[in-house]
């Protein structure tokens, strides 16, 4: 990381204040007791947009950061999982993390723990030996691992005891700890479509608004679409459209609250009419506006607008 260090220290003669390529890059070390949920944590953290590497020796952290910043991969968060099978590398950890801190990297340690009796039950349920058991009792392996990791737990930035947590609850705690945003937020994507071109297979909800009067049969509206004010006004002025939006808004709001509790980060809503040009487009935009009023992040697209109106 010589070039990164030079830029950060301002040794470049032409741009003494040039930003380091590692500026804003984050490193998270995932460690803790075997059976405490490291694998589940890694999957959840990957879903949050981190690049996750399993069983990485600490000495490879710096070259990995170099490679990711040089390749402009789009990832600016690296999470590395380290367990007791790489315990020979722990002696390198302190110096490596100190060096990364000197480079201006935001580096944190996540330590996952669980009570001994819970760990015993988890290992027995999967009928696997503890990695440090070595022919001894299961509890002996757990005690040895706890001894090895004692100092690492003390210097951890985030410690989570998973004894009483479900997988979803662990994911929620990780999201809160790593983002500082409180409970899981759910992003909503709404898209309009035409039933004549097929029902989408990737939607969580599919709504049929073909019960509304069709602007296609109004000559002055036929060549327009649901983004145009005359069409939107025609569709939304119908009492049934308002009743539908009132009911659907409430249903979606309840579902999103449940999705957040289950750690689902996004929901896709498809709204269809015959050709996907008029009613579904106008209703998608109207629903999006309502959901945004609740503070939700909502995006909208129209699947069929590139098709010629028929």
Swiss-Prot record:
Residues 1-21 are annotated as: Disordered. The keyword Ribonucleoprotein does not apply. ATP binds at residues 32-39. GO terms for molecular function: ATP binding; GTP binding. GTP binds at residues 83-86. Keywords: ATP-binding, GTP-binding, Nucleotide-binding. HAMAP family: RapZ_like. Belongs to the RapZ-like family. NCBIfam families: PRK05416.1. This is Nucleotide-binding protein BLA_1368.
